[in-house]
């Protein structure tokens, strides 16, 4: 089955200065709440004081999580679970806006956490397979691996210890599992670009996955941060490899 017979893509000319379209789904209350929130977080002093108060409140076990979820979290996140995101997905879809579910958990250090994150990423791919308003899936490799190990793996002259090599093999297995699921369900998946000093190993894995799963349709996508001075040449080299 061709990717393009299952999913329909349209080229739409957008005018980003047309706020009537951009904020069509938002009520005046939503817009006023967002305005106040952005005014508050634009102040370094307020942010610094607020962070200290938040940590203090958490130590005292005060119920601040509810407040955070109804303010800052609500502004920037669709939900804590896939099901919580469903109303937003439906609302955006009604106006022709697609959603990409991005499970943004990073900084973990235990293998069990990485495996759990992998399973949740796969759940987002399964959701995208059954939801017409989710055209792509995405994942960050820093969510399924130790950052320090990615740093070492990107420095080719550094030899890894046996335990580190084993951990690296587990990372590769997780990436393969995610991309294989995307291929089987015919869901395009982005491998998110990360910090420049760990990007080399991520690019290597992305290329391997593209070679493996993009033989019939385009399933695996690498992403490129074009503000980097070296990325245009990298993009050209990718094009040559693709040809």
Where in this protein do the model-derived segments appear?
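Short, positively charged and aromatic/hydrophobic N-terminal segments
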Residues: 4, 8-12
């Amino acid at each position: 089955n061709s990717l393009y017979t299952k999913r329909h893509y349209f080229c739409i000319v957008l005018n980003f200065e047309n706020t009537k379209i951009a904020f069509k789904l938002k009520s005046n209350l939503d817009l006023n709440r967002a305005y106040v929130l952005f005014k508050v977080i634009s102040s370094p002093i307020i942010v610094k004081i607020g962070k200290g108060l938040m940590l203090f409140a958490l130590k005292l076990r005060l119920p601040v999580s509810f407040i955070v979820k109804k303010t800052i979290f609500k502004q920037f996140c669709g939900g804590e679970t896939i099901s919580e995101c469903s109303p937003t997905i439906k609302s955006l879809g009604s106006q022709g806006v697609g959603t990409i579910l991005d499970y943004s958990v990073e900084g973990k250090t235990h293998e069990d956490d990485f495996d759990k994150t992998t399973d949740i990423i796969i759940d987002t791919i399964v959701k995208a397979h059954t939801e017409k308003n989710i055209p792509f899936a995405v994942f960050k490799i820093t969510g399924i691996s130790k950052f320090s190990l990615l740093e070492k793996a990107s420095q080719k002259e550094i030899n890894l210890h046996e335990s580190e090599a084993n951990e690296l093999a587990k990372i590769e297995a997780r990436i393969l599992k995610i991309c294989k699921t995307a291929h089987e369900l015919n869901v395009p998946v982005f491998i998110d670009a990360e910090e420049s000093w760990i990007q080399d190993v991520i690019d290597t894995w992305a290329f391997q996955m593209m070679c493996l799963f993009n033989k019939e349709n385009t399933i695996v996508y690498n992403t490129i941060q074009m503000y980097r001075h070296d990325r245009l040449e990298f993009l050209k080299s990718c094009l040559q490899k693709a040809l």
